[in-house]
Amino acid sequence: MKARRLISSGSAFEPIVGYSRAVRVGEFVFVSGTVGDGADAYEQTKSAIAKIEQALHEAGASLDDVVRTRIYVTDIAAQWEDAGRAHSEAFRDARPACSMLEVAALIRPEYLVEVEADAYLAAP
């Protein structure tokens, strides 16, 4: 079995819930659901993706290595375009497989969007 490399963001939720911001196993990097700052779905999605990018960087990957994302929103009718626009701006070239789902709520009421990402690092 390949070694697991755990990446922490320092979030207070990590030790409480028992998770890592990201885990790298071999050529794969899995980034946990990540929320962002901002007043609307666009800003929160951009912020979440910036945090994901930092975790990927610490794992030796980049946004270009992302092969799948999941976007969770609290009101898909009102938020899908803004969240989708921020996602498109970040992943314009990589164009990962992506799902967007509506959820009843996120961990805090001010959070509108949460993003997960999976990356694959091809052999050099």
Q: Each predicted region: which residue ranges?
A:
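Short, polar/acidic, helix-capping and beta-turn segments at strand->helix junctions
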Residues: 1-124
